[in-house]
């Protein structure tokens, strides 16, 4: 089971408006994360609009007391800057970076979610208590990913699932 895809609440950018539900409305939605949100220097949406929307989503996450599920492409420095002063956990979705980038994220308190496309050295280096797994846009079942990651990390899929569940419920 892909635990990060449980009950994810989306906030979207439309034109120049960041469309977020009210706090009262959001509290009625059975959600656990705010996201997927973040910054992407490759997408067509102007970066300044993305930045404004992301800042609003961060405030929303803080106001509601919900963890933030983060999408980031080529914007690490801005994300690390914006993470300072926040209290809610952030989960980096689809991490493919090098161990040096992983270390930066861990130093800033991030949790890291890996999919089928990952850097093996980063996957090995990620502490178990900061690890999540996801299928995202691949058709393969999550059980295949658990088996692959368990082999790489020299554990069992069952132990890996227990750890990821513990991480999720600890957020």
Residue ranges and their predicted role:
Residues 1-171:
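Mid-domain alpha/beta scaffold segments of enzyme catalytic cores
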């Amino acid at each position: 089971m892909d635990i990060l895809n449980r009950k994810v609440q989306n906030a979207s950018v439309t034109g120049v408006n960041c469309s977020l539900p009210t706090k009262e409305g959001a509290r009625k939605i059975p959600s656990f994360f705010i996201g997927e949100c973040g910054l992407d220097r490759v997408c067509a949406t102007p970066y300044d609009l993305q930045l404004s929307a992301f800042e609003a989503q961060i405030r929303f996450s803080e106001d509601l007391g919900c963890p933030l599920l983060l999408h980031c492409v080529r914007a690490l420095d801005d994300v690390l800057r914006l993470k300072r002063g926040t209290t809610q956990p952030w989960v980096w979705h689809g991490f493919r970076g090098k161990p040096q980038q992983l270390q930066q994220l861990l130093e800033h308190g991030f949790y890291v979610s890996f999919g089928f496309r990952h850097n093996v050295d980063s996957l090995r280096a990620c502490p178990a208590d900061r690890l999540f797994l996801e299928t995202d846009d691949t058709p393969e079942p999550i059980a295949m990913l658990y088996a692959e990651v368990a082999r790489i990390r020299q554990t069992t899929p069952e132990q890996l699932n227990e750890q990821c569940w513990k991480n999720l419920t600890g957020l």
